[in-house]
């Protein structure tokens, strides 16, 4: 390998050991849950690297079951659009952990009004307000949230008045 540039990298495999228990482990770069095993109060996550890639894992005490969003169903042009997002477990309880989100608001014609990345706070919630342009045509818009841990999505159709 001396004096060779390995642009594509070399295959590599191993195991990540984390000294804690968990109900789920998520790969934030691929947006999915990954398999792991529990042993002696720790979790072991197998990893395979085909090139020079990497992983960012989110270790969760409870599995993400759904997204919940609270927002108005109509937006007055030129005003703010407040919303609140939370992650829920299978019992409907809020997951108190930070999780990255992709937030998007687009008109029915496909015009992006807002697109951003944010994360829930330590309480498992995100509250935000989007400013809506005054010069929009009346119609509908799709407000969508994707959580980047398990890949779950939720969309709400709102009217632009």
Language model feature labels by segment:
Residues 27, 103-107, 145:
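Conserved aromatic beta-strand anchor motif in extracellular beta-sandwich/beta-rich domains
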Residues 67-71, 116, 151-161:
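Edge beta-strands of extracellular beta-sandwich domains
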Residues 54-59, 137-149:
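Short, aromatic- and glycine-rich surface loops/edge beta-strands on solvent-exposed regions
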Residues 1-82, 86-90, 95-101:
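Carbohydrate-binding surfaces of carbohydrate-active enzymes
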Residues 32, 101-117:
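Short amphipathic beta-strand segments in non-cytosolic proteins
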């Amino acid at each position: 390998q001396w004096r060779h540039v390995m642009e594509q990298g070399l295959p590599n495999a191993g195991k990540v050991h984390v000294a804690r228990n968990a109900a789920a482990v998520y790969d934030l770069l691929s947006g999915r849950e990954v398999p792991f095993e529990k042993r002696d109060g720790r979790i072991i996550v197998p990893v395979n690297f085909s090139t020079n890639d990497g992983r960012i894992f989110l270790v969760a005490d409870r599995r993400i079951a759904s997204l919940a969003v609270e927002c108005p169903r109509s937006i007055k042009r030129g005003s703010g659009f407040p919303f609140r997002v939370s992650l829920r477990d299978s019992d409907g309880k809020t997951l108190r952990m930070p999780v990255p989100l992709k937030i998007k608001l687009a008109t029915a014609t496909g015009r992006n009004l807002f697109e951003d990345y944010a994360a829930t706070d330590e309480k498992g919630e995100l509250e935000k307000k989007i400013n809506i342009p005054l010069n929009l045509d009346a119609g509908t818009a799709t407000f969508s949230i994707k959580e980047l841990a398990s890949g779950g999505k939720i969309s709400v159709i709102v009217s632009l008045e």
